[in-house]
């Protein structure tokens, strides 16, 4: 019940609203008219490729919701309805779980090489449909097309990587304590996995979970965000085309509370993997306790970006800009607080503002766009709440600070100065295009300020000093640290946080362990 209430609140918060002001402004009307033409052509291209799916996937079959209900998938830039997809609930989820459970035994018995070949084919199909997937992603999520293309490649990289790692799931032989014994450790797939994924990276967050799960021999029930199900469904369609068997991947979307509760209550689901808010992650963790499921959680962040006075300013500007404004600030590893040493604060602020001014806000389908809309009206209202809180406590708006003239859920790239630790911008994740600048005096002050949070996902530091880079990296209470770099995620490195930013790791060889169980075998009386 608590889980259902939490997910209902999250769904209510994320409800899409169309701004009355934008519907009456001439610029808003022109924007929607222009984007409608682009969106129509893009959707037709996706449809022609056979990748526009609106039904759920259960046991290899595309099925409607059992009660016939649907939900709208909207373009966040225009409010237009892109498609109506099946609104599924507990019954459909239970059937998806049953399908995954029955398929698990045959899929897990395949050789690692056989699973690897199927995954490799899936990777190749994703790459061959790179443009269509990117178009779909831009339409339903809003990110610029160039970022969407990068995400397709990034998402596919997990499939490729884990296709190879499938053949490297090694056990152990332990030296015995008695001469007539042999001690072995096997690694075996955990079973059916429930994967709950977010809207900000609608492809990569699926492949980062489903790739290792399938490589290990697990089967999966995916619950994508109701805001971005089309990308997930297209990816699942390509998985079927690649020869991944019916039932190995199932996709259900719609009624988040019902789907979540069905996954948690099922004894056949042996693992939950989730990327999303800390609040919902805590509910999933608590709900998993009743059936003692294995849990992986990649939760919210509050990333500090520390710029020391010995940093290369150009490198720091470029890295901070990338760390902050990618996907319009809607990533869990976004620089949420930019801490700048007092000696270079004014110089950095001036150069940073100039760089932010160069960001082009607009239609994600246009080549020149570098900043798309926020996902919905609720996201804009959250940003406004944080800005109002900061200015009421003494912060000053150095750039932006208001809704964009394009209307809808567009927000101006914003820089806020003199932010202090009593402000929401310092304490919580804004998840929008707002860069708070915070001055600090010493290295010790920077470390203390950076660690003054319950979150611990990503952190960034900019310095020319190698000793300082080691000291600060080791002192920061974060799972990921970028040194003189603002984009650090890769399929070959472990991704995950500490403290209340999550449990477990995704990507890399360490990500495989999240989907495996250890089995110890003692063979006796061998003399």
Curated annotation (Swiss-Prot):
Top EC class, one word? oxidoreductase
Keywords for this protein: Disulfide bond, Mitochondrion, NAD, Oxidoreductase, Transit peptide
Q: Which residues cross the membrane?
A: none
User: What pathway is this protein a component of?
Assistant: Amino-acid degradation; 4-aminobutanoate degradation
Reaction(s) the record says it catalyses: succinate semialdehyde + NAD(+) + H2O = succinate + NADH + 2 H(+)
A Gene Ontology cellular-component term: mitochondrial matrix
* Localization in the cell: Mitochondrion matrix
Control of this protein's activity: Redox-regulated. Inhibited under oxydizing conditions.
> What is the name of the protein in this document?
Succinate-semialdehyde dehydrogenase, mitochondrial
Q: In the record, what lineage is assigned to the organism producing the protein?
A: Eukaryota, Viridiplantae, Streptophyta, Embryophyta, Tracheophyta
Which gene does this sequence derive from?
Answer: ALDH5F1
């Amino acid at each position: 019940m608590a889980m259902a209430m939490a997910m209902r609140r999250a769904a209510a918060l994320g409800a899409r609203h169309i701004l009355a002001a934008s519907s009456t402004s001439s610029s808003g009307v022109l924007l929607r008219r222009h984007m409608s033409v682009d969106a129509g052509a893009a959707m037709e291209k996706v449809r022609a490729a056979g990748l526009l799916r609106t039904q759920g996937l259960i046991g290899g079959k595309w099925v409607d919701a059992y009660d016939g209900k649907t939900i709208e998938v909207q373009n966040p830039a225009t409010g237009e309805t892109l498609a109506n997809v099946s609104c599924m609930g507990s019954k459909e989820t239970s059937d998806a779980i049953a399908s995954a459970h029955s398929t698990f035994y045959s899929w897990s018995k395949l050789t690692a090489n056989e699973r690897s070949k199927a995954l490799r084919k899936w990777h190749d199909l994703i790459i061959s449909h790179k443009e269509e997937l990117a178009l779909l992603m831009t339409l339903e999520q809003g990110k610029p097309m160039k970022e969407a293309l990068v995400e397709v490649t990034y998402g596919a990289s997990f499939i490729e990587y884990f296709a190879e790692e499938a053949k490297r799931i090694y056990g152990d032989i332990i030296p015995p304590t008695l001469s007539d014994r042999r001690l072995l450790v096997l690694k075996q797939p955990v079973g059916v996995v429930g994967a709950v994924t977010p809207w900000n990276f609608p492809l990569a967050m699926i492949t980062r979970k489903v790739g290792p799960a399938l490589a290990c021999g697990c089967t999966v029930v995916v619950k994508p965000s109701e805001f971005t199900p089309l990308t997930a469904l297209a990816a699942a369609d390509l998985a079927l085309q690649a020869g991944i068997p019916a039932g190995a991947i199932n996709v259900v979307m719609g009624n988040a509370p019902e789907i979540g509760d069905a996954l948690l209550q099922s004894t056949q689901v042996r693992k939950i993997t989730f990327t999303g808010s800390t609040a919902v992650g805590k509910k999933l963790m608590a709900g998993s306790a009743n059936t003692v499921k294995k849990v992986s959680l990649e939760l919210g962040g509050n990333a500090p970006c520390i710029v020391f006075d010995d940093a290369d300013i150009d490198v720091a500007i470029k890295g901070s800009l990338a760390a902050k404004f990618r996907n319009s600030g809607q990533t869990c590893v976004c620089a949420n607080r930019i801490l700048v040493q007092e000696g270079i604060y004014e110089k950095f602020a001036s150069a940073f503002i100039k760089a932010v001014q160069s960001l082009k806000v607009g239609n994600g389908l246009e080549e020149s766009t570098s900043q798309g809309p926020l996902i919905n009206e609720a996201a804009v209202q959250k940003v406004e709440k944080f800005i109002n809180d900061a200015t009421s406590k003494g912060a000053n708006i150095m750039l932006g600070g208001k809704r964009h003239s394009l209307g809808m859920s567009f927000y101006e790239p914003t820089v806020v100065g003199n932010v202090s630790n009593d402000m929401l911008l310092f304490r919580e994740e804004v998840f929008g295009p707002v860069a708070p600048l915070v001055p600090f005096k010493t290295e010790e002050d920077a470390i203390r300020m950076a660690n003054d949070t319950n979150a611990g996902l990503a952190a960034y530091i900019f310095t020319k000093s190698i000793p300082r880079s080691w000291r600060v990296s080791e002192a920061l209470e974060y799972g990921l640290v970028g040194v003189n770099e603002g984009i650090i995620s890769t399929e070959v490195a472990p991704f995950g946080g500490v403290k209340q930013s999550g449990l477990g790791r995704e990507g890399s060889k360490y990500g495989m362990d999240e989907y495996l169980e250890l089995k110890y075998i003692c063979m006796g009386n061998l003399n």
